[in-house]
A protein has these predicted regions:
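Outer-membrane beta-barrel signature, preferentially recognizing the C-terminal barrel domain
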Residues: 1-24, 76-91, 98-101, 146-150, ...
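Outer-membrane beta-barrel strand-turn architecture
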Residues: 5, 15-19, 31, 87, ...
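Residues on the lipid-exposed face of transmembrane beta-strands in outer-membrane beta-barrel proteins
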Residues: 11-15, 93-97, 110, 155-159, ...
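C-terminal beta-signal and adjacent terminal beta-strands/loops
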Residues: 22, 31-33, 116-118, 169-188, ...
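Gram-negative outer-membrane beta-barrel transporters
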Residues: 28-180
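Extracellular loop and loop/strand-boundary signature of outer-membrane beta-barrel proteins
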Residues: 77-82, 135-144, 186, 194-199, ...
């Protein structure tokens, strides 16, 4: 294998149009050549790539199969290799605003990411696959079910009055579809009609967290809170995932839970 190489373009701006208001916007374009991953994009691409490519024994994809003395396929080997290309483009933003409210101060912090494209070209024989808005291999690398939503939003509102701060946080992830559909488009094949037993689409999810923090004697900080206030369930992907039937790196798998935290300042 050869080393990966990347070209990165980032453009950002910080604007303060009003007192107490700050807006930050960043555009990124990351292009990785010779990205390291499963040969041919994994078995999901090696098998159809060999078959639809004419099953030529000289085809590198077909050479991944091992045959026994009778000519029957006995094994499939998909080693780690250099992929053709991975390119990701998107926009990050953050809006922070604070203003007085009664005898306290109200703060808003809105941030998010819009994934414009996440192109994965698993080998030079097929077109790049746009993994933005998809889950599962090859978009999920080697862990089936990893979701790549186009929209991620993180919003927080807090009100500080005296020694108390009340806050509400909102998290949002847009829906995603099975990467098999994007894979078939790249292979110029019709959309799959006999998809295995798993979800073909993961619905969008909203999560709300609430907390109250008290400053005590200028040395201690007591926080009472609840995460996943509405007890929103994680999106399940059936047999496409080995980690609790969902993507625990994105979705909340624990449900509603309460917590108490104490911090002490050392002098």
């Amino acid at each position: 294998m050869s080393a990966e190489s990347a070209r990165t373009l980032t453009i950002g701006a910080v604007i303060q149009p009003l007192a107490g208001l700050t807006v930050t916007v960043d555009y990124y374009d990351i292009n990785i050549r010779d990205a390291i991953g499963a040969f041919g994009g994994g078995s999901g691409f090696v098998v159809p790539g060999c078959i639809f490519g004419g099953a030529d024994p000289a085809d590198p994809l077909c050479q991944a199969f091992t045959r026994d003395a009778d000519g029957f396929v006995s094994d499939l080997t998909v080693p780690t290799a250099n992929l053709a290309r991975i390119r990701t483009r998107g926009i990050d933003w953050q809006v922070a605003y604070g203003l007085p409210l009664f005898t306290g101060r109200l703060h808003f912090n809105l941030s998010g990411t819009r994934l414009l494209a996440s192109d994965v070209q698993v080998n030079s024989n097929i077109d790049p696959i746009d993994c933005a808005g998809s889950f599962g291999r090859p978009c999920g690398n080697t862990i089936q079910g990893t979701a790549t939503p186009r929209w991620k939003l993180f919003n927080r509102a807090s009100w500080t009055i005296g020694p108390a701060t009340f806050s509400l946080r909102h998290r949002y992830f847009s829906s995603t579809k099975d990467a098999l559909f994007a894979q078939n488009e790249a292979l110029n094949q019709p959309a799959p009609t006999n998809v295995p037993v798993h979800a073909t689409k993961l619905q969008a999810r909203h999560y709300f967290d609430a907390a109250t923090t008290f400053d005590i004697a200028d040395r201690f900080e007591l926080t009472l809170g609840v995460n996943n206030l509405t007890n929103a369930k994680p999106s399940l992907v059936g047999n496409q995932q080995v980690q609790a039937n969902t993507d625990p790196s994105l979705y909340d798998v624990l449900g509603r839970r309460f917590f108490v935290a104490v911090k002490a300042k050392l002098r």
